[in-house]
Regions:
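Mixed-charge, low-complexity intrinsically disordered regions
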Residues: 1-113, 125, 136-137, 143-220
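Short, structured beta-strand/loop micro-motifs enriched in basic residues and often containing a Trp
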Residues: 120-129
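Short aromatic-glycine-enriched beta-strand elements
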Residues: 114-118
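Short beta-alpha junctions and helix-cap segments that line functional grooves
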Residues: 130-132, 141
Length: 220
């Protein structure tokens, strides 16, 4: 597929996913947001104390895509509340968002058409990732924590990209030993406490101060 066709497809799906993401926020109760904020150290009593949009992005990622055992996720509640045409971009994208995966991703190389090829370090597989900001700034060997979804033949981020390094990952593991019983790395990646620990340590180390999230431009 030519570059222009790929990017047009990406921008269209990105716009759809942004709409779904905003709508899913409406399925969140304030208490649920506050609980996640406490996990990240972004709450003082009943008050949110996030200092940047980037910190709020981490908070909303956890609030939308994770939930306590026995509770439903906001993204799933939203999906059940809407009627979409089967096979439409809206339906395909929402289904992909419901199946989004968190992991540690290493930039392997540039994709021949657009974006990059990344390796899932916890599931031992590669995928084609389209993200304009990351494609312009990432170098091979760089590792990021992110939640990806696959609405097409390529993956997209769910808005969160956290640069990680060995010390931050080690701190995340020492943050809690609750998931160390997971012998299977995939179960570790699927455990919402792992994402929370990565995000919490990213905030505490100040790494999020150097991260800016931007939606892709409508046209080059």
């Amino acid at each position: 597929m030519p570059y222009t066709d790929v990017m047009d497809r990406y921008r269209g799906l990105r716009a759809v996913s942004t709409h779904h993401h905003s709508a899913a926020l409406g399925c969140l109760a304030r208490q649920a947001i506050l609980e996640q904020a406490k996990h990240l150290g972004l709450a003082y009593g009943q008050t949110l104390v996030a200092e940047s949009e980037e910190e709020m992005t981490l908070l909303f990622d956890l609030a939308i895509y994770t939930a306590k055992r026995g509770r439903s996720r906001a993204i799933d509640r939203y999906a059940k509340s809407v009627m979409l045409q089967p096979g439409s971009d809206e339906a395909l994208t929402l289904d992909a968002m419901c199946q989004a995966r968190f992991s540690l991703w290493r930039i392997e190389r540039r994709h021949e058409t657009a974006g990059v090829i990344v390796a899932d370090l916890l599931r031992d597989r590669e995928t084609w990732l389209l993200d304009q900001g990351l494609a312009h700034s990432a170098n091979p060997g760089m590792t990021v924590a992110s939640r990806l979804c696959w609405p097409a033949e390529f993956a997209m981020t769910r808005g969160v990209i956290v640069p990680v390094y060995v010390e931050l990952i080690e701190d995340a593991f020492s943050d809690s030993t609750a998931w160390l019983s997971h012998a299977d790395p995939q179960r570790l990646a699927d455990d919402p406490r792992f994402a929370a620990a990565i995000y919490r340590n990213a905030i505490q180390t100040g790494i999020m101060e150097n991260v800016v999230y931007r939606e892709p431009a409508v046209a080059d």
